[in-house]
Amino acid sequence: PSPKPSAPPEPTPTPAPTTQEEPEEEQPPVPANAPLYEISQEMIYPVGSEEICKAYSAGAPVYSTTMRDWRVHAGTDLTAESGEQVLACANGIVKQTYTDSMLGNVVVVEHGDYDFYYCGLGENFLVEPEEVVSAGQAIGTVTAVPAESADKPHLHLEVRRDAAYLDPRSVIEGIN
């Protein structure tokens, strides 16, 4: 008998080329206390002038021409033109904006460990609470500080750390 013809061999299937995806690197979770901004190593003055028209009094009373009495001056008054832009001294986050009968319109910005109170600003705030700001960003304009209205135009700047008042000039210049 003659051999039976065999069926042609089945071709061996060629596996389809695969592209192996790189496994995604797992990002560590962001800690709850992570800052929302990069903390600035250096600070700038918030107005064009570094001239102080009334210094921080470190708890000692100084005479107030407007109020006609002796009182502690908890901030530093920097000479500025009315309408001049007020700039953030460093990167930070706006904690609040409000109007105070003595300080006028106030923007509070957290700059690292410090809270800066920019006082006597125009009625139109240029920033909002929880907004992240960069050093040099305009946050308001100079107008008047009601409790210091007899003084020449200026920005009243206060700095606090853990609720304690500090000399703004020392903080800006890196002394504290």
Model regions and ranges:
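Residue-level recognition of beta-strand microenvironments
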Residues: A55, T97-Y98, L121, V142-V145
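Extracytoplasmic
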Residues: E38-S40, V47-E51, Y63, R71-G75, ...
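Short glycine/threonine/proline-enriched tight-turn/helix- or strand-capping micro-motif at secondary-structure
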Residues: A32-A34, S57-L87
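Conserved, short, structured surface segments that act as functional micro-motifs
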Residues: E131-N176
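Short, well-structured beta-strand-loop connectors
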Residues: Q85-V94, L126-V142
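Zn2+-dependent peptidoglycan hydrolase active-site motif and core
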Residues: A88-E123
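Short, acidic/hydrophobic/Gly-rich beta-strand patch recurrent on exposed beta strands
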Residues: T66-R68, D77-T79, V106-H111, E158
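Cationic-aromatic interfacial patches
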Residues: P1-T18
